[in-house]
Amino acid sequence: MTEIGYWASQEQYSMQQLIDFVKEAERAGFESTLTSDHFHPWSHTNGHGNFTWVWISAIAERTKKMKFITGVTAAVYRYNPGLIAQAFASLDVLYPGRIGLGVGSGEAMNEVTLGFDWPSAEIRVERTVESIQIIKKLWNKSENNYYDLEKTRWNSSKKDSNSNINCSVDDDGFVTFIGKYFKIQNAKLYTPPSTNIPLFMAGSGTNAIKAAAEYTDGLITTSKPEGVKETFELFDSAAKIANKDINSLEKIAKPKVSYSEDYDKAFKATEFWRTTQIDDAFDININDPRVLEEKAKREVSDDEQKKSTIIVTSIEDLISPIEKYLDAGFTKIYIHSTSPDEIEFIRLFSKKVLPYFRDKWKKA
């Protein structure tokens, strides 16, 4: 189902601020929240380092129906896939039908910081796919036409790379998985999820996009409408090969926006995210936010920064850019606002923008 949701930035705001924002978002009519999952923030100045899993439990308790998805949890090093499966199963028991998991191949700021290596993107995607396999086995996740990892076709150039995978589930539901990177032995979630938890994967490279199509319920991408056609063609093709119904899979965007009647204030409020415009920002082996921030100041121009964010002085001016995302094929759009006054943004967006799209969808 097409939806416009809210984005909660764990790196930019305190836990209490985000609780206030999301409570306001629910009152305003938003039904789901996508939220980041970092150890370090993208920028040192005014950065925060909230533990997302704790925050999700706190905010779910303080809201009534709002759904929460991580965007994304790195299933590569610092989080063991068994612990991810256990944590989100427990959240789903407490808040059934309101919890989703987004996974990805991580950033150096969160993995290298805690003593782990930073290998190639190819290896990180391989690790992520193994993690997905373990999580789904432990959840006993139901899905039609699900491919086991050893049968994967997501990386045709490495057809034999996963040939040593060994996975089994006994009659009592105990999982044993011997992989290239991860191993669990006779593991069972004694507190299993109460629902079929949605599972998504972030990706921009070929291998990650194919893996998202074959192994998860949808793709999270930072691609913009004008550059996403090839991404979606690759995603749809991989889904068809896996005998999946492409119409059942989500294509998720999270456009950055900033609103203020004063353009200069709206632009200034985007500064925290300048680091994300560094070349290869998501792959670069820099784990210190201070270094990232200084590098961004040197290398990312104001013009580049302005192009990275939809900056508006009238809230209605967000309608056209959002329509472009929908026309490009995105099914869910999470609005990543970095506005100077976030509460004002939420209230105005809910009065002027959300009703426009809901009326449009009703008539369709």
Q: Model-predicted segments: where are they?
A:
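Active-site-adjacent structural elements that line small-molecule/cofactor binding pockets in enzymes
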Residues: 1-364
